[in-house]
């Protein structure tokens, strides 16, 4: 049930490095800990911190393609805004993403047709030497509200050092104006996923908008099925290479509102069991089922999937 995606990096026609989606399953468990009153710092490959309706992941999924280190500090939520930061230095594997430290909002899976708004605010800054990295929202969908992605929607609001999105041709397929910004839209594929990437013309270090407008553009203009189910929505940075880098989110928020229909697997069925059976799913981003186990303990494999074992 648990699989590991293998990154495949190609060059853009313009010569920039290309970001690939981080894997949605890994073989090693994640250590998740609730945030205490003080800031919490973690440095393990799959470490994460929960606070105020968000889970922030260190997520060093591509670390073996280079050499370096990364740590994550979560300050917590104040006045409705999450603050966190990551420090990293990576060398080698210049065309490979090393990690995706990111914050994922806790929300049940929902059909795209049922989502009425995804309001978000993100204020951030980046410093470092010879950085190649992006700053991006990352949304995953599939047809059955499970945890195997079929579509990935990225919204890039920052890029450094020639980082570029997955693309079949290296050229944008459209230039939609969304929220007063003209974005370059790229389309590509990775493993079983179709990847859409909206890339801003420059760094937007204080972004405020509604991500549902990107979703609607894809369903209305690019053939993405509105029946797809959004099960994970995060925001973070993908580093390739650089040294002494610090990415700081000084204020972040996201919420997902639905019209009350079209979410999950539909109504009329039995209520989910109070606890999952042995080897059953017991958690993960967007998971709305049982979170305890009738046998064994609930162990996180990654930010999308936890299993009773």
From Swiss-Prot:
Indicate the enzyme's highest-level EC class: hydrolase
| Subcellular location, record wording | Secreted
Superkingdom of the source?
Answer: Eukaryota
Q: Where is the signal peptide?
A: 1-19
Glycosylated residues? 206
Keyword Glycoprotein attached: yes
Q: Assign the protein's first listed, main location to one coarse class.
A: secreted
GO CC, alphabetical: extracellular region
Which ranges carry the CBM1 domain?
274-309
What are the GO BP annotations of this UniProt entry?
A: cellulose catabolic process
Catalytic activity as recorded in UniProt: Endohydrolysis of (1->4)-beta-D-glucosidic linkages in cellulose, lichenin and cereal beta-D-glucans
**Similarity annotation:** Belongs to the glycosyl hydrolase 12 (cellulase H) family.
Stated name of the protein: Endoglucanase cel12C
Q: Which gene encodes it?
A: cel12C
